[in-house]
Amino acid sequence: MSRIGEIRRTTKETDLHVRVELDGRGTADVRTGIGFFDHMLDALARHALLDLTVEAQGDLQVDGHHTVEDTGISRGLALEQALGDRAGIRRYADALVPLDEALVRAVVDVSGRPYLAYAIDIPKWQMLGDYDVFLTPEFFRAVVLNAGLTVHMDLIRGDNPHHIVEAAFKAFARALDGATTIDPRVVGVPSTKGAL
């Protein structure tokens, strides 16, 4: 069974190609034009053990918002496609990830009901290279809404914006890997309703 999703999406603001292979090895080929964001998407692929391709052309002369949000939309759509009928997955998983003083928790339910509870307050606004830290929830919201996930993300502690954002991406990645893993003990779709 091949769990691959591929999306091509073009608007007046962005032109994107995203490919996700859930049963990958954690490789990434990412080019968004936003260096720190590329680094975060690479970390997401590596720690979720999925293969990820992102080719994005955006209106970066305006700012990074459209590129980050539209990458999240396309990433979510590709993930939803790769999940298929969701048969055999574990469905639920959580992860706590530290990065120096920062500690972030992510909890994922591959529920088919999109909801994001995002309690990661960055203590101070900062640009990380050409990446605005306040775009982080926009990315996760776009992924969650388009993949049909329920996700809770919490900052346990931390004060360095770089560490907090990176721990958030890695915690989400680890929880996503756990929730989308095929478990041979699971027969069919893991829901009493019979569908997700």
What are these regions (language model features)?
Residues M1-L196:
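Structural preference for solvent-exposed beta-strand-turn elements
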